[in-house]
Amino acid sequence: YYEDVEGNGMIAKMLQKFYEAGEDSRKTTGTILQIAFLTFRYQQLKKAVMQENAVLDSSLESDFVMAYQLHQNGEIDDVDFNIYVTLSQEMQANVNGSPWNGLPDLAVYLQIDPDHEIDEIQHRGREMEDIRDKPELVSYYNRVNQAYREWSKGYTRSTLLTVNRDKYDFVNHPEDRNAVLDQIEQKLVDLGKLSPQRFAEIQQQRAVTE
């Protein structure tokens, strides 16, 4: 389950508004944008918890980190943030009784240097995120990066695997991608969620397709 910004017209338009005027536009659109992301993620999670071996590229908790840092910076006010928290908690509670529970067996945190992250954002090529047009976005990106670093230190809801994104370019280099997949699958073996035999089969299949 992927976060498809370009394929979701509603969120794409809201993101444009969110970015268009820096802090001012974050204050006017931050709450509704985060609720939109929360709703989209909840819809994905409702489907994922009914499946075995589902993988999501984000989570309700990850969305909460974004909303929390906007609130901490005064870009979401107390009333709106309390509404957001109530919605988030209700959504999580609604999936907790599902067959595979609403919490992941394993969460993966891609830790990345702030400057490297900005380079990746620029390479992604979304005009609304371009720091050449909006240099004030650098401080915003750095703030988000730090918020996730702090979140990772206190995360206890499931096992967390931290992957050094500065070391692995798994987008452009298959060997890096396989190294990261090996780490993830080995952790699943350690947790009893994947058998050693199946892990070996998966590694062999990847070797054949390289």
Which functions belong to the PLM regions below?
Residues 122-210:
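NTP-dependent small-molecule kinase module
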Residues 1, 54-56, 106-108, 161-163:
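Hydrophobic/aromatic beta-strand patches that form the interior of the parallel beta-sheet core
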Residues 9-14, 108, 170-175:
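Short, solvent-exposed polar/charged micro-motifs at secondary-structure junctions
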Residues 46-49, 97-102, 153:
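Conserved catalytic network of the ASCE P-loop NTPase/AAA+ motor domain
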Residues 66-146:
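A glycine- and Lys/Arg-enriched "phosphate-lid" helix/loop adjacent to the NTP-binding pocket
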Residues 1-34, 39-40, 67-69:
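Conserved substrate/cofactor phosphate-moiety recognition/catalytic segment
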Residues 33, 38-79:
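A basic- and aromatic-enriched beta-loop-alpha substructure that forms the phosphate/nucleotide-
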Residues 6-7, 60-62, 112-117, 167-169:
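Conserved nucleotide-binding/hydrolysis micro-motifs of P-loop NTPases
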